[in-house]
C-alpha cells in the first residue's frame, strides 16, 4: 500500500509489468480488430502515411469494460470510415498493459478510467481526455461470500483486486467510507481476471471486480455487498489521446469523437449490425452484454458537454478528477496533487461534434 501509484506507473513504462492475465483472452494476447496477435504493432504499417489513414490507422487500446466494448460496434458498423478516419482496435486483456503501451507511445489513444489519468501528469506524460464513454453505475463492485454482511465484516479477511487500478482506489474508498483502511484487511494483489476465479474457488473472502468478471463472480455464488451504484460518477471511463496527435491532427480526433456519438445513437436504437459487431468483438452473448450495460450510463454528446463543465459534484468531470487526486494523495498512492489537472481535459471535440 505504501508503494506509490507513480512508482507503479513508472515500472509499467519501463516494461517491468508484474500484473498478468486480466480479461477473456490469454495472458499475452492482444486482440486486434477481432484477431489475436502477439505483436502490438500488428504487422508492417506505412509510417510515412498520415496517421488515421487506411495505411496507417490510429491505434486505440481497448480493455474489458461494458462501455468500451461499444467501440467494436463503431468499428464493425463502418462508422469510423464514414467519418473519414481509420482506427485499429487493440484489445488488452490486462488493463494495466494498455496503460504501459499508451505511455510508451505504442498506442495513439486509450480507453482509460479518469482516476488513472491523474498520476501520469506528475511524470510529464502528455495526453488529454477528450471524451467520456460511460460512467459506472453498478459495473464495478465488491463481492463477498456468505457470512459477510457488512464492510466491517471484512476486518481480517482476504480481499483481492488489482494494485494501482481504479478497483484498488474503489476498495480504498469503500473502506474509508466505513471507517477502515487497507490495513484492516488482508489485501491480495491480483489482476481482475485472476481475482474473479480465485473468489469463485473460495481462495479469497472478497474481491473488487469490474465487468464482465463481476457478473461471473456473482453467477459463481458471490454476493454483491457494494457497488458504484452507491457512488455514482466516481468512475468515469474516458478516451485519452496523446497531445501531439491532438495538436497536429485535430481532424482525426474529431472524426473519432464524432464516430463515438454516431455509435451511441445506434447502441441506444439497438441497431442489429452495430450490436452484433459488439457481441462478436467482445465475445459475449446478447444476454450477457445487455446485462452488463445495465451497470453503466453511456454518454452521448449532451451528457459529455454536461460532464466536462465545472461543478461541485461527481456529475462534473473536472470535480471528479480533482476529488480522485485528493483521494489518491490521502491514501499515499500519489505524493503530490498535480498542479495542472485541468490540462488533462480537452472539451473542444465534444463542443465541435457534429
Enumerate the language-model features and the residues they cover.
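Pocket-lining segment of extracytoplasmic ligand-binding domains
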Residues: 115-116, 187-188, 194-283
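Short, glycine-/small- and polar/acidic-enriched structural segments
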Residues: 29-189, 205-211, 224-227, 233
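Solvent-exposed, acidic/flexible segments
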Residues: 64, 91-95, 135, 164-168, ...
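Short, low-complexity disordered leader/linker segments with a strong preference
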Residues: 1-55, 352-354
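Short polybasic/polar patches that bind polyanions
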Residues: 81, 121, 176, 218, ...
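Secondary-structure end/capping motifs
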Residues: 248-333
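Conserved C-terminal helix/tail region of periplasmic/extracytoplasmic solute-binding proteins
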Residues: 321-354
Amino acid at each position: 500500500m505504501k508503494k506509490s501509484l507513480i512508482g507503479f506507473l513508472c515500472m509499467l513504462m519501463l516494461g517491468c509489468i508484474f500484473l498478468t492475465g486480466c480479461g477473456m483472452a490469454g495472458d499475452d494476447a492482444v486482440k486486434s480488430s477481432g484477431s489475436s496477435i502477439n505483436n502490438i504493432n500488428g504487422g508492417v504499417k506505412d509510417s510515412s502515411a498520415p496517421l488515421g489513414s487506411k495505411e496507417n490507422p490510429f491505434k486505440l487500446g481497448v480493455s474489458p469494460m461494458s462501455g468500451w466494448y461499444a467501440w467494436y460496434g463503431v468499428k464493425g458498423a463502418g462508422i469510423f470510415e464514414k467519418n473519414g478516419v481509420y482506427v485499429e482496435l487493440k484489445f488488452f486483456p490486462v488493463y494495466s498493459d494498455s496503460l504501459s503501451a499508451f505511455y510508451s507511445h505504442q498506442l495513439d489513444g486509450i480507453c482509460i478510467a479518469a482516476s488513472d489519468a491523474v498520476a501520469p501528469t506528475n511524470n510529464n506524460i502528455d495526453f488529454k481526455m477528450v471524451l467520456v464513454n460511460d460512467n459506472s453505475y453498478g459495473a464495478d463492485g465488491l463481492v463477498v461470500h456468505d457470512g459477510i454482511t457488512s464492510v466491517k465484516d471484512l476486518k481480517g479477511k482476504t480481499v483481492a483486486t488489482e494494485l494501482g487500478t481504479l478497483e484498488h482506489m474503489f476498495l480504498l474508498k469503500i473502506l474509508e467510507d466505513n471507517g477502515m483502511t487497507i490495513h484492516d484487511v488482508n489485501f491480495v494483489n491480483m489482476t481482475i481476471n485472476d481475482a474473479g476465479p480465485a473468489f469463485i474457488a473460495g481462495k479469497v473472502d472478497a474481491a473488487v471486480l469490474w465487468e464482465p468478471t463481476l457478473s461471473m463472480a456473482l453467477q459463481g455464488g458471490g454476493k454483491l455487498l457494494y457497488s458504484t451504484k452507491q457512488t455514482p460518477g466516481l468512475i468515469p471511463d474516458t478516451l485519452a489521446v496523446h497531445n501531439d496527435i491532438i495538436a497536429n491532427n485535430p481532424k482525426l480526433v474529431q472524426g473519432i469523437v464524432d464516430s463515438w456519438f454516431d455509435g451511441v445513437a445506434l447502441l441506444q436504437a439497438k441497431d442489429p449490425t452495430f450490436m452484433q459487431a459488439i457481441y462478436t468483438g467482445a465475445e459475449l452473448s446478447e444476454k450477457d452484454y445487455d446485462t452488463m450495460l445495465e451497470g453503466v450510463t453511456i454518454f452521448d454528446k449532451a451528457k459529455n458537454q454536461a460532464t466536462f463543465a465545472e461543478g461541485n459534484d461527481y456529475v462534473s468531470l473536472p470535480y471528479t478528477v480533482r476529488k480522485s487526486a485528493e483521494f489518491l494523495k490521502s491514501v499515499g498512492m500519489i505524493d503530490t496533487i498535480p498542479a495542472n489537472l485541468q490540462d488533462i481535459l480537452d472539451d473542444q471535440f465534444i463542443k465541435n461534434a457534429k
